[in-house]
Protein backbone atom coordinates (compact mmCIF):
# COMPACT_ATOMS: atom_id res chain seq x y z
CA UNK A 1 0.00 0.00 0.00
CA UNK A 2 2.75 2.42 0.88
CA UNK A 3 4.56 1.59 -2.30
CA UNK A 4 1.58 2.47 -4.42
CA UNK A 5 1.11 5.81 -2.70
CA UNK A 6 4.77 6.51 -3.09
CA UNK A 7 4.50 5.83 -6.84
CA UNK A 8 1.58 8.23 -7.25
CA UNK A 9 3.43 10.93 -5.40
CA UNK A 10 6.46 10.49 -7.58
CA UNK A 11 4.40 10.80 -10.78
CA UNK A 12 2.72 13.91 -9.50
CA UNK A 13 6.04 15.48 -8.68
CA UNK A 14 7.40 14.77 -12.15
CA UNK A 15 4.29 16.21 -13.77
CA UNK A 16 4.57 19.38 -11.77
CA UNK A 17 8.20 19.71 -12.72
CA UNK A 18 7.46 19.33 -16.41
CA UNK A 19 4.66 21.89 -16.32
CA UNK A 20 7.00 24.46 -14.88
CA UNK A 21 9.54 24.15 -17.73
CA UNK A 22 7.72 26.58 -20.16
CA UNK A 23 10.19 29.25 -21.18
CA UNK A 24 9.22 32.86 -20.63
CA UNK A 25 8.26 34.84 -23.78
CA UNK A 26 6.83 31.87 -25.59
CA UNK A 27 3.29 32.52 -26.88
CA UNK A 28 0.80 29.86 -27.01
CA UNK A 29 -0.58 29.42 -30.52
CA UNK A 30 -3.96 30.99 -31.05
CA UNK A 31 -6.71 28.55 -31.15
CA UNK A 32 -7.76 27.60 -34.65
CA UNK A 33 -11.41 27.88 -35.30
CA UNK A 34 -12.53 25.19 -37.56
CA UNK A 35 -15.12 26.10 -40.16
CA UNK A 36 -18.39 24.59 -39.38
CA UNK A 37 -19.72 22.44 -42.16
CA UNK A 38 -22.78 23.79 -43.94
CA UNK A 39 -22.09 27.44 -43.19
CA UNK A 40 -21.24 29.94 -46.00
CA UNK A 41 -20.11 33.48 -45.97
CA UNK A 42 -22.94 35.89 -46.84
CA UNK A 43 -22.66 37.29 -50.36
CA UNK A 44 -23.93 40.57 -51.74
CA UNK A 45 -26.87 40.15 -54.19
CA UNK A 46 -25.93 40.85 -57.80
CA UNK A 47 -28.38 43.33 -59.35
CA UNK A 48 -29.98 42.17 -62.61
CA UNK A 49 -28.57 43.74 -65.77
CA UNK A 50 -30.45 46.82 -66.80
CA UNK A 51 -32.21 46.57 -70.14
CA UNK A 52 -31.86 49.59 -72.44
CA UNK A 53 -35.07 51.52 -72.77
CA UNK A 54 -36.22 51.28 -76.40
CA UNK A 55 -36.45 54.62 -78.11
CA UNK A 56 -38.80 55.39 -80.99
CA UNK A 57 -36.92 57.07 -83.85
CA UNK A 58 -38.26 60.46 -84.66
CA UNK A 59 -40.10 60.74 -87.97
CA UNK A 60 -38.49 63.34 -90.21
CA UNK A 61 -40.84 66.09 -91.17
CA UNK A 62 -41.98 66.06 -94.79
CA UNK A 63 -41.13 69.31 -96.52
CA UNK A 64 -44.00 71.11 -98.11
CA UNK A 65 -44.33 70.27 -101.77
CA UNK A 66 -43.80 73.26 -104.00
CA UNK A 67 -46.66 74.25 -106.21
CA UNK A 68 -46.46 74.31 -109.99
CA UNK A 69 -43.98 76.76 -111.32
CA UNK A 70 -45.68 79.29 -113.46
CA UNK A 71 -43.35 80.95 -115.85
CA UNK A 72 -44.36 84.39 -116.79
CA UNK A 73 -43.44 84.95 -120.38
CA UNK A 74 -40.85 87.63 -120.71
CA UNK A 75 -40.86 89.55 -123.90
CA UNK A 76 -43.31 87.06 -125.39
CA UNK A 77 -43.40 87.19 -129.15
CA UNK A 78 -46.73 88.66 -130.19
CA UNK A 79 -48.84 86.55 -132.46
CA UNK A 80 -48.61 87.66 -136.05
CA UNK A 81 -51.61 89.56 -137.28
CA UNK A 82 -53.82 87.78 -139.74
CA UNK A 83 -53.22 89.13 -143.21
CA UNK A 84 -56.18 90.33 -145.22
CA UNK A 85 -56.22 90.94 -148.97
CA UNK A 86 -58.39 92.71 -151.49
CA UNK A 87 -59.38 89.56 -153.36
CA UNK A 88 -62.39 91.11 -155.04
CA UNK A 89 -60.28 93.71 -156.85
CA UNK A 90 -57.96 90.96 -158.12
CA UNK A 91 -60.68 88.47 -159.13
CA UNK A 92 -63.08 90.68 -161.09
CA UNK A 93 -60.79 91.66 -164.01
CA UNK A 94 -59.37 88.15 -164.36
CA UNK A 95 -62.82 86.53 -164.42
CA UNK A 96 -63.90 89.06 -167.07
CA UNK A 97 -60.98 88.02 -169.30
CA UNK A 98 -61.67 84.33 -168.76
CA UNK A 99 -65.32 84.72 -169.84
CA UNK A 100 -64.15 86.26 -173.11
CA UNK A 101 -61.68 83.46 -173.88
CA UNK A 102 -61.97 81.56 -177.14
CA UNK A 103 -63.36 78.06 -177.02
CA UNK A 104 -65.73 78.70 -174.12
CA UNK A 105 -69.24 77.53 -174.95
CA UNK A 106 -72.09 79.39 -173.34
CA UNK A 107 -74.37 77.38 -171.07
CA UNK A 108 -71.62 74.99 -169.97
CA UNK A 109 -71.21 73.74 -166.40
CA UNK A 110 -68.11 75.07 -164.60
CA UNK A 111 -66.44 73.41 -161.61
CA UNK A 112 -64.51 75.97 -159.52
CA UNK A 113 -61.69 74.52 -157.42
CA UNK A 114 -60.67 76.02 -154.06
CA UNK A 115 -57.88 78.58 -154.25
CA UNK A 116 -54.59 76.88 -153.39
CA UNK A 117 -51.85 78.59 -151.33
CA UNK A 118 -48.43 78.34 -152.96
CA UNK A 119 -46.87 81.40 -151.35
CA UNK A 120 -43.90 81.43 -149.00
CA UNK A 121 -46.07 81.96 -145.91
CA UNK A 122 -49.39 81.36 -144.20
CA UNK A 123 -52.40 82.55 -146.15
CA UNK A 124 -56.10 82.01 -145.55
CA UNK A 125 -57.54 80.88 -148.88
CA UNK A 126 -61.16 80.70 -147.75
CA UNK A 127 -61.89 84.40 -148.47
CA UNK A 128 -60.15 84.07 -151.86
CA UNK A 129 -62.37 81.14 -152.87
CA UNK A 130 -65.49 83.02 -151.78
CA UNK A 131 -64.41 86.06 -153.79
CA UNK A 132 -63.84 83.89 -156.90
CA UNK A 133 -67.25 82.25 -156.66
CA UNK A 134 -68.80 85.65 -156.03
CA UNK A 135 -67.22 87.08 -159.20
CA UNK A 136 -68.70 84.19 -161.22
CA UNK A 137 -72.11 84.18 -159.53
CA UNK A 138 -73.92 86.44 -162.01
CA UNK A 139 -72.12 85.51 -165.23
CA UNK A 140 -74.21 84.62 -168.28
CA UNK A 141 -71.89 81.98 -169.72
CA UNK A 142 -71.40 79.29 -167.06
CA UNK A 143 -73.55 77.41 -164.61
CA UNK A 144 -71.54 76.81 -161.47
CA UNK A 145 -71.38 73.49 -159.63
CA UNK A 146 -72.69 74.25 -156.12
CA UNK A 147 -70.40 74.08 -153.12
CA UNK A 148 -72.53 71.25 -151.70
CA UNK A 149 -72.13 69.15 -154.85
CA UNK A 150 -68.37 69.75 -154.88
CA UNK A 151 -68.06 68.86 -151.18
CA UNK A 152 -69.86 65.55 -151.69
CA UNK A 153 -67.72 64.72 -154.74
CA UNK A 154 -64.53 65.43 -152.75
CA UNK A 155 -65.65 63.26 -149.86
CA UNK A 156 -66.18 60.37 -152.26
CA UNK A 157 -62.48 60.65 -153.11
CA UNK A 158 -61.42 60.94 -149.44
CA UNK A 159 -60.82 64.71 -149.58
CA UNK A 160 -62.06 67.36 -147.20
CA UNK A 161 -64.16 70.25 -148.56
CA UNK A 162 -61.17 72.60 -148.10
CA UNK A 163 -58.74 70.41 -150.06
CA UNK A 164 -57.70 71.35 -153.55
CA UNK A 165 -58.58 69.00 -156.39
CA UNK A 166 -54.91 68.20 -156.75
CA UNK A 167 -53.91 66.25 -159.83
CA UNK A 168 -55.51 66.88 -163.21
CA UNK A 169 -56.80 63.30 -163.45
CA UNK A 170 -58.53 63.64 -160.09
CA UNK A 171 -60.10 66.95 -161.14
CA UNK A 172 -61.38 65.39 -164.37
CA UNK A 173 -62.91 62.51 -162.43
CA UNK A 174 -64.76 64.86 -160.07
CA UNK A 175 -65.87 67.10 -162.95
CA UNK A 176 -67.36 64.18 -164.82
CA UNK A 177 -69.05 62.97 -161.64
CA UNK A 178 -70.88 66.30 -161.25
CA UNK A 179 -71.46 66.82 -165.00
CA UNK A 180 -69.06 69.75 -165.51
CA UNK A 181 -67.46 70.53 -168.87
CA UNK A 182 -64.84 72.94 -167.47
CA UNK A 183 -62.67 73.18 -164.37
CA UNK A 184 -61.24 76.50 -163.14
CA UNK A 185 -58.04 76.27 -161.09
CA UNK A 186 -56.76 79.19 -159.00
CA UNK A 187 -53.73 79.60 -156.75
CA UNK A 188 -51.83 82.33 -154.92
CA UNK A 189 -48.05 82.20 -155.34
CA UNK A 190 -44.92 84.23 -154.65
CA UNK A 191 -44.43 86.52 -151.63
CA UNK A 192 -47.19 86.16 -149.06
CA UNK A 193 -47.13 89.93 -148.46
CA UNK A 194 -47.87 90.62 -152.15
CA UNK A 195 -49.08 87.35 -153.71
CA UNK A 196 -49.76 86.75 -157.37
CA UNK A 197 -53.10 85.22 -158.33
CA UNK A 198 -52.97 82.67 -161.16
CA UNK A 199 -55.92 81.01 -162.93
CA UNK A 200 -56.26 78.19 -165.46
CA UNK A 201 -59.38 77.03 -167.30
CA UNK A 202 -59.32 73.36 -168.31
CA UNK A 203 -61.58 71.57 -170.79
CA UNK A 204 -62.68 68.33 -169.11
CA UNK A 205 -63.16 66.38 -172.35
CA UNK A 206 -59.51 66.71 -173.40
CA UNK A 207 -57.74 67.91 -170.24
CA UNK A 208 -56.43 70.89 -172.22
CA UNK A 209 -55.81 74.28 -170.61
CA UNK A 210 -57.70 76.66 -172.88
CA UNK A 211 -57.08 79.85 -170.91
CA UNK A 212 -54.72 81.13 -168.20
CA UNK A 213 -54.09 84.47 -166.57
CA UNK A 214 -52.54 86.12 -163.52
CA UNK A 215 -52.75 89.34 -161.53
CA UNK A 216 -51.44 91.03 -158.39
CA UNK A 217 -53.25 90.92 -155.07
CA UNK A 218 -53.03 93.87 -152.69
CA UNK A 219 -52.77 93.37 -148.93
CA UNK A 220 -55.12 95.58 -146.94
CA UNK A 221 -53.44 95.07 -143.53
Swiss-Prot record:
Quick one: where's the N-palmitoyl cysteine lipidation?
21
Q: What is its main location?
A: membrane
From the Swiss-Prot or TrEMBL record, state where the protein is found: Cell outer membrane
Q: Which domain of life is it from?
A: Bacteria
* Gene3D superfamilies listed in its UniProt record: ABC-type transport auxiliary lipoprotein component
Topology with respect to the bilayer: Lipid-anchor
Q: What Gene Ontology molecular-function terms does this entry list?
A: enzyme regulator activity
- Indicate whether Lipoprotein appears among the record's keywords: yes
Its keywords, alphabetically, are: Cell outer membrane, Cell shape, Lipoprotein, Membrane, Palmitate, Peptidoglycan synthesis, Signal
- Region Disordered, as annotated, extends over 29-82
Task: Point to the regions of Pro residues compositional bias.
Answer: 44-57
Instruction: Quote the Pfam families the UniProt record gives.
Output: LpoB
**Stretch forming the signal peptide:** 1-20
Keyword presence, Membrane: yes
Q: Which GO terms describe its cellular component?
A: periplasmic side of cell outer membrane
Protein purpose? Regulator of peptidoglycan synthesis that is essential for the function of penicillin-binding protein 1B (PBP1b).
Quaternary data: Interacts with PBP1b.
Q: Which family does it belong to?
A: Belongs to the LpoB family.
- Output this protein's name: Penicillin-binding protein activator LpoB
Amino acid sequence: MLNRMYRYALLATVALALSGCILPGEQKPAPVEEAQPGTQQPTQPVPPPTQPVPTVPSVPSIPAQPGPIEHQPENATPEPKARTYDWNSAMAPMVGKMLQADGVNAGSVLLVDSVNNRTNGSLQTGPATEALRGALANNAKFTLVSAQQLSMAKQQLGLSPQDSLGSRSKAIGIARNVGAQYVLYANASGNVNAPTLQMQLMLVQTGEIIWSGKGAVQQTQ
